[in-house]
């Protein structure tokens, strides 16, 4: 039995889960918020009871020390020697990393070198890695990359039709994200279908505040909707998804915004929030549609129809599909979104049951038993994938 901690470090936050392996039992989980800001918040669950503390947490090293201190204080572990491995989520692995890696100083340096590909995320992930290394220098640590699963995409999927030297010199290509989630749910779908993943064509819809669709053939990602950054693809909570690139100088000219300001608008003020004008939270949008809010209705239709189109194009790409998977916050919980996305897909053999679709947050088949294409809701579990990779690489 080993104890593995899975870490997801953001710029001012640190999410954690402690697993007992190989049983994959969650011993505790929690969140440190507002790191480096006033009134930091530390939350941990102890015997299914949430304990919260507010205190100043100046940096990630302090957050890590606090977390480890609480694990022993609450008797979750006897001492720090019980921690056998640490798994870190790293958003961008570039072309360099097509699998998770054991973290050496050299590997940390290589991750730092590709940080320009994900300036919002990778630096924070690295801060988390270094904070743990400082406090637990002898515990093996593994980096698990969001982009790694998509490194199996063929050239025709990942190349942009730009001058080829941009790819050679600057690494400009599609990378794709949510890879750990897409990998988990497609492997789980194969188990639920009782078929080897090698013979399956799956479309995975990871729908949260960020959303991406992946075409997974024989267990390998062959295409995905996000691109060089997580801004591409379908419309999201606050992100625009795909737009005509010529709009950027046009918007700059019309509004007087700089390129960075337009990019900020595309990342933080667009998507569901941009169209509805009042919220990026899908639950608010759905409630507003019930009250007859037309802009909310439009936002919901745009969101669902873009996903619907990706499903059609990926089915064509794989010459068919065996199952469609819904996961992440919206995919797992929004009956309405699934209904709108699936509507009209009968022509390709998707027959779903409105009664079975009335499910939230748990594994379920929502297609009729006779449906040639199965539709499955699978709650994602990126943390357990991280823990499994630590066991695979460090033990």
Swiss-Prot record:
Substrate binds at residue 89. Mg(2+). Can also accept Mn(2+). GO terms for cellular component: cytoplasm. InterPro entries: Ac/propionate_kinase, Aliphatic_acid_kin_short-chain, Aliphatic_acid_kinase_CS, ATPase_NBD. Mg(2+) binds at residues 8, 382. Coiled coil: none annotated. It comes from the Bacteria. The active site is at 146 (proton donor/acceptor). It is an enzyme of class 2 (transferase). Pathway: Metabolic intermediate biosynthesis; acetyl-CoA biosynthesis; acetyl-CoA from acetate: step 1/2. The keyword Thylakoid does not apply. The record marks 178, 239 as: Transition state stabilizer. Its main location: cytoplasm. It holds the Pfam family Acetate_kinase. It is found in: Cytoplasm. Its cofactor is Mg(2+); Mn(2+). GO terms for molecular function: acetate kinase activity; ATP binding; magnesium ion binding. Keywords: ATP-binding, Cytoplasm, Kinase, Magnesium, Metal-binding, Nucleotide-binding, Transferase. Catalyzes the formation of acetyl phosphate from acetate and ATP. Can also catalyze the reverse reaction. This is Acetate kinase. The gene is ackA.
């Amino acid at each position: 039995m080993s104890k593995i901690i899975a870490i997801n470090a953001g710029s001012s936050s640190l999410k954690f889960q402690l697993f007992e392996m190989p049983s994959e039992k969650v011993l505790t989980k929690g969140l440190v918020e507002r790191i480096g800001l006033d009134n930091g918040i530390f939350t941990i669950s102890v015997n299914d009871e949430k304990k919260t503390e507010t205190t100043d947490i100046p940096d990630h090293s302090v957050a890590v020390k606090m977390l480890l201190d609480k694990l022993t204080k609450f008797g979750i572990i006897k001492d720090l020697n019980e921690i056998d491995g640490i798994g870190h989520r790293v958003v961008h692995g570039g072309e360099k990393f097509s699998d998770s890696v054991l973290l050496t100083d050299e590997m940390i340096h290589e991750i730092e070198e590709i940080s320009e590909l994900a300036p919002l995320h990778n630096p924070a992930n690295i801060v988390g890695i270094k904070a743990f290394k400082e406090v637990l220098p002898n515990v093996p640590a593994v980096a698990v990359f969001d982009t790694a699963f998509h490194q199996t995409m063929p050239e025709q999927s990942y190349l942009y039709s730009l001058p080829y030297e941009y790819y050679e010199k600057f690494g400009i290509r599609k990378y794709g994200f949510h890879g750990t989630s897409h990998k988990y749910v497609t492997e789980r779908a194969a188990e639920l279908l009782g078929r080897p993943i090698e013979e399956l064509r799956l479309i995975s819809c990871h729908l949260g505040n960020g959303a991406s669709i992946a075409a997974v053939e024989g267990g390998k990602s062959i295409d995905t909707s996000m691109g060089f950054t997580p801004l591409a693809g379908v419309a999201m909570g606050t992100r625009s998804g795909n737009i005509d690139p010529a709009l950027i100088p046009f918007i700059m000219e019309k509004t007087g915004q700089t390129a960075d300001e337009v990019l900020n608008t595309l990342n933080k003020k667009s998507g569901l929030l941009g169209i509805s004008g009042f919220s990026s939270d899908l639950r608010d949008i759905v409630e507003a549609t019930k009250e007859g809010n037309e802009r909310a209705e439009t936002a919901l239709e745009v969101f669902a129809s873009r996903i619907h189109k990706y499903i059609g194009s990926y089915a064509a790409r794989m010459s068919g599909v065996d199952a469609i998977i819904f996961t992440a916050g919206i995919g797992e919980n929004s009956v309405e979104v699934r209904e709108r996305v699936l509507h009209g897909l009968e022509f390709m053999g998707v027959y779903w049951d409105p009664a079975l679709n009335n499910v939230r947050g748990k594994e379920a088949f929502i297609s009729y038993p006779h449906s040639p294409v199965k539709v499955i809701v699978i709650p994602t579990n990126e943390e357990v994938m991280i823990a499994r990779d630590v066991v695979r690489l460090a033990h």
